[in-house]
UniProtKB/Swiss-Prot annotation:
This is E3 ubiquitin-protein ligase siah-1. Zn(2+) 1 binds at C213, C220, H232, C236. Residues 205-400 are annotated as: SBD. Pfam families: Sina_RING (PF21362), Sina_TRAF (PF03145), Sina_ZnF (PF21361). GO terms for molecular function: ubiquitin conjugating enzyme binding; ubiquitin protein ligase activity; zinc ion binding. Keywords: Metal-binding, Transferase, Ubl conjugation pathway, Zinc, Zinc-finger. Coiled coil: none annotated.
Length: 419
């Protein structure tokens, strides 16, 4: 086996040199039989080229790379000169697209540092390494086109949302999301039986993919692992806002910037008070049935909605009425976490208070009322603080980063003196 550097075993090159010498003799014999001046010039040109090429090949057999002779193309130099593969591994592995000739390449070469191994490499019997492209899935380094192509595999053909595990496919391999599958009688793609075979391989791939938020078209720039995607979307500040008024009569949805305009245009009866401390006066609290009282409070360049809701509790033993008071911010949950509200009932040396973080209108007040995560009291307690059927609630809203105001009668540990 020959050495690519020409350090020994140059039999291949000697054969080529001998062939070129014979060609040179043929050129000289042809030129001796010619007496024309033009052929003589041609003879000199061929003779010089042949001598130069022979000298270059001799130099290369001694370890010097041959230059391309004038008048002869690189392709002509390749004829009969392709060396055998070296027995010793190269110092650097290259991903080559083209033909290797005398230690050079005729096309683009992408080199890797010595000792490194490219991704997905396989070695053939001739010692040539073939390299398959490594495409990152949904992570840094993947192009937008490749990421979009991979994500398209997870699109449900019915709702066009991204499917989350578990993945169920039909006998033909067609997928449908878990939300749409119970509503289908057959596969929406091939009309075969409803997808019922679990695709475990796709679930493993999904663990490496970052899925965009459902509301990315509305401006959300975040991507998530499939396990965190649903939780984020429930509180994403880019999701459509529902009408914050209690009750199910208004089905409006829109952007955050449109909420106040909707309230002023559709719910004109709602009163807005300015300031951090106001009195929320609910009139006619003795009205039968379920009743809601709503008021707006504007401060710190934000708008808050105050809700007092009365519900009938149909207990066969003792029917009662319950009141629930809560404050929600016209904004996101992240913004709501910057504030604290305080509700207080006081009359005849009695006082009842509640302090908490405002609810975001994304969260609504339904869950807070169901869990009694608000100021809750029954009709008997309401009568203790009401006057002529009207109930006044003191509402104070404070920023968390500012000292909160205290009631004059409240004492803290710092106010106590010890002997």
């Amino acid at each position: 086996m020959s050495n690519r550097n020409g350090g020994g075993g140059g039999g291949d090159y000697q054969d080529v040199i001998e062939s070129l010498r014979r060609t040179q003799l043929i050129f000289e014999e042809d030129d001796n039989n010619s007496s024309d001046s033009a052929p003589q010039a041609n003879h000199l040109s061929r003779h010089q080229t042949s001598n130069s090429l022979v000298e270059d090949m001799v130099n290369h057999s001694n370890g010097n790379p041959p230059p391309v002779p004038p008048g002869i193309t690189q392709q002509q130099c390749q004829i009969g000169l392709t060396p055998r593969m070296s027995a010793s591994p190269p110092s650097a592995v290259s991903t080559i697209s083209g033909t290797a000739v005398l230690g050079k390449t005729m096309a683009r070469v992408q080199s890797n540092p010595p000792g490194s191994i490219p991704h997905n490499t396989t070695t053939t019997a001739q010692g040539i390494q073939s390299v398959a492209p490594h495409i990152p899935i949904g992570g840094g380094g993947a192009t937008d086109d490749s990421s979009a192509e991979i994500l398209s595999v997870f699109e449900c053909p019915v709702c066009l949302e991204y499917m989350l595990p578990p993945y169920m496919q039909c006998s033909s391999g067609h997928l449908v999301c878990s939300n749409c599958r119970p509503k289908l009688q057959c596969c929406p793609t091939c009309r075969g039986p409803t997808p019922s075979v679990r695709n475990l391989g796709l679930e493993k791939i999904a663990n490496t993919v970052r899925f965009p938020c459902k509301f990315s078209t509305s401006g959300c720039p975040l991507n998530f692992h499939h396990a965190d995607k649903t939780e984020h979307e429930e509180l994403c500040e880019f999701r459509p806002y529902c009408c914050p008024c209690p009750g199910a009569s208004c089905k409006w949805q829109g952007g955050l910037s449109d909420v106040m305009e909707h309230l002023k245009k559709i719910h004109k009866s709602i009163t807005t008070l300015q300031g951090e401390d106001i009195v929320f006066l609910a009139t006619d609290i003795n009205l039968p049935g379920a009743v809601d009282w709503v008021m707006m409070q504007s401060c710190f360049d934000y708008n808050f909605m105050l809700v007092l809701e009365k519900q009938e509790k149909y207990d066969p033993a003792q029917p009662t009425q319950m009141f629930y008071a809560v404050v929600q911010l016209i904004g996101s949950k992240k913004e709501a976490d910057n504030f604290v509200y305080r509700l207080e009932l006081s009359a005849s040396r009695r006082r009842m208070s509640w302090e908490a973080t405002p609810r975001s209108i994304h969260e609504g007040v339904v869950v807070a009322i169901q869990q009694s995560d608000c100021l809750a009291f029954d009709s008997n307690a309401a009568q203790l603080f009401a006057e002529n059927g009207n109930l006044g609630i003191n509402v104070t809203i404070s920023r968390i980063d500012t000292p909160q105001r205290r009631h004059p009668n409240e004492l803290e540990n710092s106010d106590l003196e010890y002997d």
